[in-house]
């Protein structure tokens, strides 16, 4: 769904109307507007290709958990605090950059291998389509994890915190075109 399409105009009017309608509804600290915006953002992202929703969910879950585990290491303190935080930062970086690198560069490396060694590795070509916005949300989720690792912020907690973090990652107006937000904007 392109921003200048009729489909987006209809989508935007519906989302704006629902956002306004849910303005006053709040329960247990959960804002209905945030839930609606998250659902709309996932719909928007899934509209391109529903299979890519799993990628954004994986990035969101990995970084949410990594942030919580790093905070546990920070709160435990001690001289080995950094040693206990580092595996969670590495897990976040490997997962996020691994997904980004796979989708962005896999076919390039297969083609380079074919050209360099004169072999036919056509069976390895996956004809992958680059998921829309993967660079933006990858670096955005990583900024969250890095800020927690550097102790510049504390992670969000609980399921309401998770929903807020998921919305921070997937918010549809900035998901496919940026800008990449700092985690402190959460």
Model-based region annotation:
Residues 1-186:
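Membrane-embedded transmembrane alpha-helical bundles that form the catalytic cores
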């Amino acid at each position: 769904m392109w921003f200048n399409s009729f489909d987006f105009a209809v989508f935007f009017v519906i989302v704006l109307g629902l956002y306004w309608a849910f303005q006053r509804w709040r329960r247990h600290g959960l804002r209905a507007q945030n839930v609606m915006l998250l659902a709309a953002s996932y719909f928007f992202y899934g509209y391109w290709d529903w299979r890519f929703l799993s990628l954004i969910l994986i990035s969101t879950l990995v970084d949410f958990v990594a942030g919580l585990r790093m905070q546990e290491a920070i709160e435990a303190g001690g001289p080995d605090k950094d040693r206990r935080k580092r595996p969670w930062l590495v897990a976040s970086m490997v997962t996020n950059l691994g997904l980004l690198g796979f989708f962005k560069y896999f076919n390039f490396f297969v083609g380079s291998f074919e050209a360099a060694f004169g072999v036919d590795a056509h069976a390895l070509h996956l004809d992958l389509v680059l998921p829309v916005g993967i660079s933006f949300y990858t670096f955005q989720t990583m900024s969250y994890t890095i800020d927690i690792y550097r102790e510049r912020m504390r992670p969000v907690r609980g399921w309401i915190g998770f929903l807020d973090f998921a919305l921070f990652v997937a918010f549809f107006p900035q998901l496919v075109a940026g800008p990449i937000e700092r985690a402190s904007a959460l």
